[in-house]
Regions:
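NAD(P)+-binding Rossmann beta1-loop-alpha1 motif at the extreme N-terminus of oxidoreductases
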Residues: 1-50, 66
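Rossmann-like NAD(P)(H) cofactor-binding subdomain of soluble oxidoreductases
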Residues: 78-136
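Rossmann-like NAD(P)-binding element
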Residues: 49-99
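Residues at the C-termini of beta-strands that transition into short coil/loop
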Residues: 32, 62, 102, 125, ...
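A general structural motif
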Residues: 23, 69, 94-95, 118, ...
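Internal alpha-helical scaffold of NAD(P)-dependent oxidoreductase catalytic cores
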Residues: 136, 141-189
Length: 189
């Protein structure tokens, strides 16, 4: 699967390394692409090396990052949702998956025009793991992986389909919930 991650911080770096390690084509959109190495190493809480993933590209070009992606993960803070949606809209297409992690209330409004255009919009109730950058663009800590992922989507009826498509990215169980609001208002977010 061709996966783009918007945001090269703690979570985006961990997700990029994980998906690349699991054999997917990964692009990270970052404001500082020059700081990233080709491979990102993942470490556990006791400094033990877990794995590394080879990132296909790190870019600050929206078209290059979004246009060919099957799945786009948005890992930026909620206050950046409206601007992010505007910037990626020209390069999204019907059927493309847009995932918010962690899912947040009001994201559905920020991305409403993309949903209206036919993107498959969803959010995770929690993150893959607590993540902390060890060395920016080069390594990251995975501190407490989640036992499973909860997915809520708009429209709600596609949550099971999305779970089936994204579960191989993470290698952990994915469970659909009734609707996006269940994800958006989970107390852990």
């Amino acid at each position: 699967m061709k996966v783009t991650i918007i945001g090269g911080g703690n979570l985006g770096t961990l997700m990029g390394a994980t998906f690349a390690y699991r054999g997917h084509d990964v692009i990270i959109h970052s404001s500082k692409p020059e700081k990233f190495s080709e491979e990102i190493e993942v470490y556990g809480k006791n400094e033990e090396f877990l794995y590394k993933g080879k990132i296909n590209k790190v870019t600050n070009d929206w078209k290059e990052a979004i246009e060919a992606a099957d799945l786009v993960w948005v890992t930026v803070p909620p206050q950046m949702f409206v601007e992010t949606a505007k910037l990626i809209k020209p390069f999204t297409h019907k059927g493309q998956m847009i995932g918010i992690v962690p899912g947040a209330g009001a994201a559905e409004f920020a991305f409403e025009s993309l949903i209206d255009d036919g993107v498959r919009f969803f959010g995770l109730a929690r993150v893959l793991s607590i993540a902390r950058v060890k060395e920016y663009g080069k390594s990251v800590y995975m501190l407490g992986p989640a036992p499973e992922l909860l997915i809520g989507s708009i429209p709600a009826k596609i949550a099971n389909e999305i779970c089936q498509e994204i579960q191989p990215l993470f290698g952990i169980n994915c469970r659909p919930v009734a609707n996006y609001l269940v994800v958006a208002f989970t107390p852990s977010n």
